[in-house]
C-alpha cells in the first residue's frame, strides 16, 4: 500500500494504518479484512458463519466504509453474499454501525465490528433495517452455495482482494456445511401415522361419551335402543380386527346408565313422599265426609235414633 498518498498526521489515517498492521500481524480464522489500495477508507471483508448454526461453514463477503472522522464515528456495513439474515448491497442496521452512532465507542475497531457481526448472524432480526429472516434450511442452502465462488463486485482491484480473502477463509472453513435434515417435512407423516393409530380409540371414547350422555335423558326401555345404536356406531368406526372395544362400549354404556338412574332414584326428595301421604289422607277425609252426608240425607241417622227411644 502506498502510505505516502495519505497524510499520516490525520487521526483517521493514522488509526486505519495501525489497524491494518494489527490485522496482518494477528490474522483470525474467523474473518479477514483488507482496505483498497486506492482508498483506505473502503474495506473488503469476509466472515465465516458461526459454528453450530445454519450459517456454519458459509463464507460471507461484504464491504466496510469508514467515515472521515473515524474512529470517533462508526463505520457502515454491507453484505455482498446472499445469507438469509441480511440483505445484500444494503447498509445494515446494527448497534455497531452508522445507524447507531450513540452506541459506538472510539476504542472499537474493524476487528471488533467483524466479531460482533458474526455474533449477530444467528440472532433474530426484529424488523431491523437491512435484515431478512429466511428459514433455517434456506440459510443452510445459501451457506453451501457461498463456498463455491466469491461474489463479483466492483473494480478489478477490488475483485482481486475479494478473491484473495475468499481463498483465505476457505482454507480456514474446513467444515463443509450439509443440508439440514428434513425434520419438518417428515414430521407430518409421523404425526399422521400416530394419529391413524389413535383414531379408533378416540372414536370409541366419543361413542362412550355419547352413549352415557344419552342414557341420562331417556327411560329404561330407551337405554337398550341407545346401547344398540352405540354398538352399531362403534362397529362402523372400529376396524373388524378389534371387536373388543365395541363390546366394552356396550358394557360401559349399560352399566353407566343403570348407575346414573340408581343415583337419581336414591336422590329423590323425601318431600315427594310426604306430599303423597298427605294427598292420600286428604282423600280419605273427603270420602268420610261424603259418606256421612249421604247417610244423613237418606234418614239413616233419624231411624237409628227412633229405635233407641
UniProtKB/Swiss-Prot annotation:
Taxonomic superkingdom: Eukaryota
EC number: 2.3.2.23
Keyword check for Manganese: no
Keyword terms: ATP-binding, Membrane, Nucleotide-binding, Transferase, Transmembrane, Transmembrane helix, Ubl conjugation pathway
Pfam families the UniProt entry points to: UQ_con (PF00179)
Residues of the UBC core domain: 11-166
A biological-process GO annotation: protein ubiquitination
ATP-binding keyword on record: yes
InterPro entries linked to this entry: Ub_conjugating_enzyme, UBQ-conjugat_E2_core, UBQ-conjugating_enzyme/RWD
Residue spans crossing the bilayer: 275-295
Positions annotated as active site in the UniProt record: 93
Topological category with respect to the lipid bilayer: Single-pass membrane protein
GO CC terms, sorted: endoplasmic reticulum; membrane; perinuclear region of cytoplasm
Catalyzed chemical reaction(s): S-ubiquitinyl-[E1 ubiquitin-activating enzyme]-L-cysteine + [E2 ubiquitin-conjugating enzyme]-L-cysteine = [E1 ubiquitin-activating enzyme]-L-cysteine + S-ubiquitinyl-[E2 ubiquitin-conjugating enzyme]-L-cysteine
Location of this chain's protein in the cell: Membrane
Class of the enzyme per the UniProt entry, highest EC level: transferase
Gene3D superfamilies tied to this protein: Ubiquitin Conjugating Enzyme
Family in the record: Belongs to the ubiquitin-conjugating enzyme family.
Reported function: Accepts the ubiquitin from the E1 complex and catalyzes its covalent attachment to other proteins.
Protein name: Ubiquitin-conjugating enzyme E2 32
